Amino acid sequence: MSEASIAKKAELVDAVAEKMKAAVSIVVVDSRGLTVEQDTVLRRNLRESAVEFKVIKNSILRRAAEKAGLEGFDDIFTGPSAVAFSNEDVVAPAKIINDFAKDAEALEIKGGAIEGAVSTKEEIQALAALPNREGLLSMLLSVLQAPVRNVAYAVKAVAESKDEDAA
């Protein structure tokens, strides 16, 4: 192998390691058997949620994971691998890929990492079942509003009953 080729691969390892360090969520999949159309739709869905999706050689992924300080990926980096990196939403890549895998049987989740901790296929699928950040915030807001709403209804009912008594 030429020195230029080795230097390019070293740069690629460094770039992937930086992506792994910066990512809050990483999902590794085997996308063998996806049609071009399915792959295009999957990539579009991921891009809309600010998730980067790349097909990367396992040897580069192993070296990058080692450089990023992530251990336990050896079982995950077997066979063809595509990786989804998210720097913002922990749930987005898992949810999009899991939902897509229900329709496209060729797509198989292998595992990943959540906030720097290596995760199994089952943990990624469990993460996918959670609502996204906006959904969780709206649930929290509705829980916080419920007592205030109940007090408002009680005050309104008391006011209406006093109006009826006065009339």
From Swiss-Prot:
GO MF annotations in UniProt: large ribosomal subunit rRNA binding; structural constituent of ribosome
Classification via PROSITE patterns: RIBOSOMAL_L10
GO biological process: translation
NCBIfam families, per the entry: PRK00099.1-1
Intrachain disulfide bonds: none
UniProt superkingdom: Bacteria
General function of this protein: Forms part of the ribosomal stalk, playing a central role in the interaction of the ribosome with GTP-bound translation factors.
Originating species: Streptococcus mutans serotype c (strain ATCC 700610 / UA159)
Keyword field: Ribonucleoprotein, Ribosomal protein, RNA-binding, rRNA-binding
Pfam family membership, one: Ribosomal_L10
GO CC term, one of those recorded: large ribosomal subunit
Gene name of the encoded protein: rplJ
HAMAP family: Ribosomal_uL10
Protein known as: Large ribosomal subunit protein uL10
SUPFAM superfamilies: Ribosomal protein L10-like (SSF160369)
Family to which this protein belongs: Belongs to the universal ribosomal protein uL10 family.
Quaternary structure note: Part of the ribosomal stalk of the 50S ribosomal subunit. The N-terminus interacts with L11 and the large rRNA to form the base of the stalk. The C-terminus forms an elongated spine to which L12 dimers bind in a sequential fashion forming a multimeric L10(L12)X complex.
